[in-house]
């Protein structure tokens, strides 16, 4: 008994049959199982391959199977195939003129003979030998026809080409020439093919009857159109090949990035390398400095600013040296002002040689005119007002200097009560761990409130330049081995809950009472604060009280009550005038009239 299922090896000789995906899977050489119950004949087996590999588009006319160079007929039984046989799969071609690139007369003649030859069916008798014997002069007729064919080939008219130009070996029936021809004319090659085919057919069918000749003429017309279609197909295939070549050339020449893109990429790489080098230098400097050599840790903002400016100048000098040489370097004279100076003179030049800029302040009511400086007016009153305002501005830094120079008695400071405001300067204490891991209350420290969250009640305190934060470091080995338990960050800021601060006192507030709070903290027992105050009724009040006799809290309360009374009197006076005139004063009216500068002057004097 033969096996019902046999393994067969398939080889696709023409790789254009399979798709790209199938080629990637390696199906050009594959195994297939042949079930002899289902596939009894070779045609059924070829249909099975046709459908399993989905070759409908690639092989519209079917497949032809062959083994060891011999074709397997479709009507043959599948028992011909044995286990592990190699079967070659080819594409079945059309019945007429499917040979690509062969347009000779012999191929055309052979194709027509194949069509005219009757199909041989099994069981029918062949009578070709008997008919050939009955005919007389069979060999002679064939020789005569061959001679006539040679004469026809010799008398084919040739095109005359000019001697100046070389004859091109390329086919002249290109797409460009077809586009130029508006009328539907046949090419010379097509005419030659049709003429040769018609002559051969006529000579071969001279001996037939008139009825048969009429039928043959119809077939002749059909045959003349077929070689035309063949030549068209060949030209289309040539055009498709040219198009594929152009696509391959365009794919090979890939677009390169532009010059600007390359420069930007190089600049980005340079910046990354520069930042990496800076980080490495900072780490090295931190590692070199030992922690035991730091007796007192102080946060100095001026030193950090100077270092930052130096690094900026060095970076700018490097950039300039890379591009234009060591000729000019930008130097920051003051905030927002940069001047270009030679590199040799930057170290020797000092900021004292630069002229001082006028401290110009804007009062909110002045506008700049042509040929006029910002913040100055041509009227005499504005000049006097600006002088008075500058005097007040100069007195405030003097008070700040006294605060910085003189030591503050934290016990005399007023307790910080009320709502926490941004910008207030407070003194506070903390509970810190000592070297023996025991809690201890620290000394008074001063910080400025930079951020406050009322929901979580978290406060961010920034250090003040006049009051640096000091941390005592012990020289014991045990203390050096312990980790850093400090609550402060690297920049000196402290982020803590407000309730965790102990004994909070106000050093300087953002309101107008800041100077009085600071003065109360200074140890000056025998000084009287005398300041004339101008009320709405133009009465001078000179309260003289000594700080030693009265507490600072009472002073603040009295000052607030006096200001409230002055404001209430001023409001009553304005309301009376407004009622008599029939309307109240608006902000626009104050700005448009001469009362605007007067009100600003009074506000600057802190009287209203």
Curated annotation (Swiss-Prot):
Residues of the signal peptide: none
Residue ranges, compositional bias (Acidic residues): 141-155
Compositionally skewed regions (Low complexity) per UniProt: 558-585
Span(s) of short sequence motif Nuclear localization signal 1: 163-170
One GO BP: RNA processing
Compositionally biased tracts (Basic residues): 161-179, 256-269
Amino acid composition bias (Basic and acidic residues), ranges on this chain: 235-245
Coiled-coil region(s): none
Keyword annotations of the record: Nucleus, Phosphoprotein, RNA-binding
Pfam families given in the database record: Coilin_N, Tudor_Coilin
Compositional bias annotation for Polar residues: 211-228
GO CC annotations on file: Cajal body
Region called Disordered, residue ranges: 134-272, 513-585
Cellular location(s): Nucleus; Nucleus, Cajal body
Chain ranges for the short sequence motif Nuclear localization signal 2 as given in the UniProt record: 253-260
Modified positions (Phosphoserine) in chain numbering: 187
GO MF term list: U1 snRNA binding; U2 snRNA binding
Result when mutating residue 15 to A: In NOD-RK1; Decreased RNA-binding. In NOD-RK1-2; Loss of RNA-binding
Subunit structure: Homooligomer. Interaction with RNA results in multimerization due to structural alteration in the NOD domain.
Domain remarks: Contains a N-terminal ordered domain (NOD) (1-117), central internal disordered domain (IDD) (118-349) and a C-terminal domain (CTD) (350-608) with an atypical Tudor domain containing probably two large unstructured loops.
Role summary: Probable component of nuclear coiled bodies, also known as Cajal bodies or CBs, which are involved in the modification and assembly of nucleoplasmic snRNPs. Required for CBs formation. Binds snRNAs and non-specific artificial RNA via the N-terminal part of the NOD domain and via the NLS2 region (212-282) of the IDD domain. The two sites are able to function independently and provide effective RNA-binding in a non-cooperative manner.
Protein family according to the UniProt entry: Belongs to the coilin family.
UniProt name for this protein: Coilin
Source organism (scientific name): Arabidopsis thaliana
